[in-house]
C-alpha cells in the first residue's frame, strides 16, 4: 500500500509539472576549440518595442553557464546546477530593463567541456534557450539571434593538482580579445 501511494504521489507530481511545448528552441554555435576545452559564445538579439510592458517574464537556460544582459545591464546568472534529465532554468522579469524603441538581449555562455567540474553536467555543446511568457515572444531564441565565438577566455591548462580534483581548473581572461560592447551592439 505504501509503495502504491508513493508511486501515485510522484506520478501526480510529474504530471503537474510544466510539460508544455515551448515556442523557443535551443540555439548554439560551432566552436573552433575541441569539446575538451573551455568555450565561450556571445549571443544577441535586438527588437523594437512600441510600448514597455508592466511585466515581461522570460525563462532562460544555457549549457553550461550564462550571464544575461538587457540593454547592457546584467540581469541574471545561471542556470542552477542541472543534470541531463532535469535541466534547470531561471525565470526573470526583464520589464524594468526594457525601454520604448530598440532593446537588446544578450548572453555570454560558457561551456567547460570535458574537463568541467564534477558538479557541472552538460552536453559539451554551447547552447542557449530564452523563452518569453505571454504574448510578446520577440526575444524567444530562434535562428535570428546573432552569435559570436570568443577567444578571450581559456582554461588554465598548466593547472595541475596531484590526486583527485573535482573543481574547475580556472580561467584565463585576455581583455585584448574581448568583444567590448557586444551586449549593446556598440562594437
Annotate each predicted stretch with a short phrase.
Residues 52-54, 95-104, 131-139:
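A short, structured loop/turn motif at beta-sheet edges
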Residues 15-19:
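Sec/Tat signal peptide C-region and signal peptidase I cleavage site
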Residues 4-13:
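Sec-dependent N-terminal signal peptides
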Residues 37-49, 88-94:
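Short beta-strands within extracellular/lumenal beta-sheet-rich domains
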Residues 30-41, 79-87:
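Extracellular beta-rich ligand/substrate-recognition surface
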Amino acid at each position: 500500500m505504501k509503495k502504491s501511494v508513493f508511486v501515485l504521489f510522484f506520478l501526480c507530481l510529474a504530471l503537474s509539472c510544466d510539460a508544455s511545448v515551448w515556442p523557443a528552441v535551443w540555439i548554439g554555435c560551432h566552436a573552433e576549440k575541441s569539446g575538451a576545452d573551455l568555450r565561450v559564445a556571445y549571443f544577441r538579439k535586438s527588437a523594437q518595442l512600441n510600448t514597455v510592458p508592466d511585466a515581461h517574464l522570460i525563462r532562460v537556460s544555457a549549457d553550461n553557464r550564462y550571464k544575461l544582459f538587457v540593454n547592457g545591464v546584467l540581469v541574471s546568472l545561471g542556470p542552477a546546477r542541472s543534470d541531463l534529465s532535469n535541466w534547470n532554468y531561471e525565470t526573470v522579469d526583464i520589464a524594468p530593463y526594457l525601454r520604448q524603441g530598440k532593446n537588446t538581449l544578450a548572453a555570454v555562455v560558457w561551456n567547460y567541456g570535458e574537463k568541467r567540474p564534477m558538479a557541472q553536467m552538460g552536453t559539451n555543446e554551447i547552447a542557449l534557450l530564452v523563452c518569453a511568457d505571454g504574448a510578446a515572444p520577440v526575444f524567444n531564441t530562434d535562428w535570428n539571434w546573432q552569435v559570436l565565438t570568443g577567444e578571450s577566455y581559456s582554461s588554465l591548462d598548466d593547472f595541475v593538482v596531484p590526486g583527485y580534483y573535482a573543481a574547475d581548473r580556472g580561467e584565463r581572461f585576455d581583455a585584448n580579445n574581448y568583444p567590448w560592447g557586444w551586449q549593446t551592439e556598440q562594437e
